[in-house]
Design a protein with these regions (language model features):
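Activation segment signature within eukaryotic-like protein kinase domains
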Residues: 102-103
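Short beta-strand micro-motifs within the conserved protein kinase catalytic domain, predominantly
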Residues: 60-72
């Protein structure tokens, strides 16, 4: 299936609001979520604000397109790494400097979101990806 130039691949994750699919475009690998036309109309301002966020600690929104059936496709960067809730307790997080780097990254990401007028609403360790380089990236911005 192809939506707005994005080839839909395998399901990456299934959340409360539905699946996230892996997708590819000329810009590389990304994740795509679909929302109903009603949800899209309600969340369009949030997505527009999200495009203004420029922080390496917030997953980037690449595109928002309408599918042929009227649903909204939200395309965000794919962030390699593991959720913080999986990382907690691992040897990689034991050094104090590493923990500090993660907390500072979360704070910077939240500051960027709030600066754009976005309230996350569900900031949990499961919604923070720790990249292999130890950078914290806030995800799950799509919905309120």
């Amino acid at each position: 299936m192809n939506i707005g130039g994005y080839e839909i691949g395998q399901v990456f994750h299934v959340g409360a609001r539905g699946p996230l699919w892996r997708t590819r475009s000329s810009d590389g690998e990304a994740l795509l979520a679909l929302r109903s036309s009603d949800d899209g109309e309600r969340l369009l301002d949030r997505w527009k604000a999200w495009t203004s966020v420029s922080s390496r600690h917030v997953v980037a929104l690449r595109d928002v397109v309408r599918s042929d059936d009227g649903r909204w496709a939200i395309v965000q960067d794919f962030v390699p790494g593991r959720p913080l809730d999986v990382e907690i307790g691992s040897a990689d997080l034991r050094p104090k400097a590493t923990r500090r780097q993660i907390v500072e990254g979360i704070a910077a990401g939240m500051s960027a979101l709030h600066g754009a007028g976005i309230v996350h609403g569900d900031l949990t360790p499961a919604n923070i990806i720790v990249t292999p380089q130890g950078r914290a990236v806030i995800i799950d911005i799509i919905d309120e």
